[in-house]
Amino acid sequence: MPITVEIVDVGVEERFFDEVFSYFDYVDKKFSTYKDNSEISKINRKEIQEVDFSPDMKQVFQLSEETKKITKGYFDIKSKDGQYDPSGLVKGWAIHNAAQILIRHGFVNFYVEAGGDIQAHGKNSHGENWRVGIRNPLNQEEIIKVIGLSGNGIATSGTYVRGQHIYNPHDIENKILDILSLTVIGKNVYEADRFATAAFAMGKDGIYFIEEFPGLEGYMVDKNGIATMTTGFKNNVLE
């Protein structure tokens, strides 16, 4: 997936970007279910037992189990055939960790984006909050909302780009057809990503889960193109 990093502080050198992109390469090689030699693929083939999981894999499994409990089973990295796919959590987790790399180097004004999910810090080159567009799932050329971000993260789950890749673990056989996209703003992109995935799996009820969850705001577009937003979402809207 495309990855974008922008830093507007002084003292930026190519090595800082290299470090971030190297980290994403590491994550991809470890967690990609499309790579036969990744750790997660070896786990799915039962070539690696839990006791021998790497520290990062153990952390991701722990966070996934925690998210499953919080969402009452709507987030589950284990499919019905027993295979594990932690991608619904790993992307946001990796973006958040990449942002921490830049923070440790002393950077204040930057954003990190991967596959449409974003962690933003500080201000953009105009001294304003970072501007993020939410696409219309019925017309991807159209931006239907512009959000201002600073020190928080945003993630969108949906079926309008990749098709039906998210399922309701409580009703696996039926596709999620009543909504097309659900965008979540959280204190960081990791929080936004994992709960966007879980909320989308809930269908139309997902926006109410986001409404009631502390620290999250959401924006849902249903199959008819009708949007529903949480109470505080408007506080993040620029246009």
Kindly give the residue locations of the regions a language model identified.
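Mature catalytic core of soluble alpha/beta enzymes
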Residues: 1-239
